[in-house]
Design a protein with these regions (language model features):
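Boundary at the C-terminal end of the N-terminal hydrophobic targeting segment
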Residues: 23-25
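Extracellular polysaccharide-degrading/modifying enzymes targeting complex plant/algal/animal polysaccharides
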Residues: 27-250, 255, 260-262, 270, ...
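Glycine- and acidic/polar-rich repeat regions and solenoidal domains
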Residues: 74, 81, 209-211, 233-249, ...
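N-terminal secretory signal peptides that target proteins for export/translocation
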Residues: 1-7
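Bacterial N-terminal signal peptides
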Residues: 11-20
Length: 616
């Protein structure tokens, strides 16, 4: 009886506490017709998101109503836990835009298609993008200056000219702009072909970011349902503070979901590093190792940093990366994002360009993303350990679909569709490639002398440093076609394991695989087809491939351990991995799974939906 009463008392306390939390949580409203002197109720909304952010407390929700909000949201605090977070959301069914730009009028015609406008420097406040040079570690300027400013005509991003004389010429393929900052004013020249800019929508970058806290440790924030664009973001190398159009700034537990994010001078979404006095002064492997040690003393651990969720976003038109994160992305999930048109202007270059560029993807899951026209789709640079890259669709990426650079693993790459001219670029060890469709080239780096970290199990704690010989990779049950070629592994320095792979239409096996299934005359006739309900992959397969070889379901046990860290291939929570579903989530045949990412094909031509169209 006493035990029953005690249990009832505990349950009552829990219920009372939960109801108290619910009762204390508030919803604040923001609307274009509101006022920042209002109380934020539905009847008396604030006018700016920033005003609501100042009063919101853990557990509160900020609902923003339709309109364009030209402001930088700097959340002054975060939530207390995953259950008591601060949520910023667009009102259901309403289009809410947050922009780092301002509308500019009063353009004066100079000649032909060239116009100019002169603005007082106070228009920009403390930050002027037209005086802000893009620079930093591993940045390649191509012999000219680049600024974080931008000019948009009816939403179209003009290209920055290197010199004013270029803007004064007739408009070529790409319309140009040029800026000059004097002590009191900023003048912008721009080409507006066949239009009067005073009769069009012309916007210019003014703010460095759109949603970014000015200090680290603003945890447990949700940002949902917005269109966010136009940010004068800086170059974001792994050795500096990484500011994105939206960014988490060295915090924990953010959810960034169902947003449209575009038009960033450098980075769209940052899950990145804090800033310090060593920013952009560490352009070497040894210096980055020192950066890592400083991060460990600055709270880089499982309890403090990472655990973010970035899902169902559309990210485009960023000239460095769609998503970036140096050490701050650990233990995160990046899923179901459409990332495209990254690094398209190609006016500058550097070692940080990708759809997704992560340093230290420790226990990070990158799954079901659609990445194309991004230069490089995914780049796991240093410290990919416990990383899973699963069921991603990558094509039309000019550099490669996946680059693993100086990682020691374990990294599991399964059920992906890699269709770009180069599928894999491997300068690492400890990778497991399982049930992928690989149509492009595979580059294997024989040896890299850089000493890079490996970590204790499911931890940021550094266990040691090691150089990077090629090998210690596993390839099981993959479907190679066209340029897919495993022969670079014939001379790998470390052992490799291969089995159950199929090679079509000129794809080449490695001598390391004892019994590959070779079908040199089989044409998969592969191409993508857009339909109203999504994107489909059309290809030819043959059911006989199942019967011609016996394959087994790939598991933690069958993969063994990555050699250098001595760790198994398992999930972030430490449970065993079993590759028993395919790209679409269909159960694998437990007795003899089919090669490649699709488990139940039909012989001959078939259409497989690889991306489902859905409203945000």
């Amino acid at each position: 009886m006493i035990a029953t009463q005690s249990k009832s008392l505990v349950l009552g306390i829990i219920y009372f506490t939960w109801m108290t939390l619910l009762a204390s949580a508030k919803e604040y409203h923001v609307g274009k017709s509101g006022s920042d002197q209002n109380d934020g109720s539905a009847a008396r909304p604030y006018q700016t998101i920033s005003a609501a952010a100042l009063v919101a407390q853990p557990g509160d929700v900020i609902t923003v109503h339709e309109g364009i909000y030209r402001e930088r949201v700097n959340p002054p605090r975060g939530g207390k836990s995953d259950k008591k977070r601060i949520t910023y959301q667009a009102a259901s069914g309403e289009k809410v835009e947050i922009e780092g730009s301002e509308v500019v009028t009063n353009w004066e015609k100079v000649q032909d298609d060239t116009w100019k406008v002169t603005l007082p420097n106070r228009f920009f406040g403390a930050f002027n993008p037209y005086a802000d040079l893009i620079h930093g570690d591993w940045f390649l300027r191509k012999g000219r200056d680049h600024h974080t400013g931008a000019v948009y005509l009816n939403g179209n991003w003009l290209s920055e000219a290197a010199v004013l004389e270029s803007v004064l010429k007739p408009t070529g393929t790409n319309a140009l702009w040029f800026g000059r900052v004097d002590p009191e004013t900023t003048t912008i020249w721009a080409q507006f072909k066949d239009v009067n800019p005073n009769e069009q929508l012309v916007e210019i970058n003014v703010r460095q970011s759109v949603f970014y806290p000015d200090k680290p440790g603003r945890n447990y924030i949700t940002v949902r349902g917005f269109t966010m664009r136009h940010a004068a973001t800086p170059w974001a190398p792994p050795t500096a503070e990484q500011i994105g159009l939206i960014g988490t700034h060295w915090s924990k537990g953010w959810i960034i979901e169902n947003n449209v994010i575009s038009d960033s001078a450098c980075v769209g979404v940052s899950l990145g590093k804090y800033g310090d006095e060593w920013d952009n002064k560490s352009e070497s492997a040894d210096a980055y190792n020192r950066t890592i040690q400083r991060a460990l003393t600055n709270g880089w651990n499982k309890a403090t940093v990472g655990h973010h969720v970035v899902r169902h976003n559309t990210i485009s038109s960023c000239e460095q990366a769609g998503i970036v994160g140096s050490m701050g992305a650990v233990f995160s999930e990046i899923t179901s994002n459409h990332i495209f048109n990254i690094w398209t202007k190609r006016q500058f270059n550097g070692a940080e360009m990708a759809g997704i560029k992560i340093h230290a993807s420790i226990d990070v899951v990158i799954e079901h993303n659609w990445i194309h026209d991004a230069g490089r789709a995914m780049w796991m640079d240093w410290m990919a350990q416990g990383t899973r890259i699963s069921a991603n669709l990558c094509y039309s990426n000019s550099t490669d679909d996946l680059f693993l650079e100086v990682d020691h693993g374990p990294v599991l790459v399964d059920n992906n569709i890699f269709l770009s001219p180069t599928s894999l670029r491997i300068c690492s060890q400890g990778g497991a490639f399982v049930h992928n469709l690989i149509a492009g080239k595979i580059y294997l780096n024989a040896y890299d002398k850089r000493q890079t970290p490996y970590h204790k199990e499911h931890s940021t704690a550094v266990a040691g440093l090691h150089d990077n010989p090629g090998g210690d990779d596993r390839y099981y049950n993959n479907l190679f076609m066209q340029s897919g070629d495993l022969s670079p592994y014939d001379t790998a320095k470390l052992p490799v394991w291969m089995g159950g792979n199929v090679f079509l239409a000129g794809a080449k096996a490695s001598r390391c695989e004892t019994d590959p299934l070779l079908k040199p005359d089989f044409d998969p006739a592969i191409h993508l087809v857009e339909m109203p309900d999504g994107l489909y992959l059309e290809l030819m397969q043959d059911l006989d491939w199942r019967m011609e070889r016996t394959r087994t379901v790939v598991t933690t046990k069958s993969l063994g351990k990555a050699a250098i860290p001595g760790l198994p291939y398992e999930t972030p929570d430490g449970s065993s991995v079993r590759i028993n579903t395919d790209y679409s989530g269909i159960a694998r045949n437990a007795a003899n799974p089919f090669p490649g990412p699709f488990e139940n094909p039909a012989s001959g031509k078939q259409l497989v939906r690889v991306w489902r169209s859905a409203a945000r």
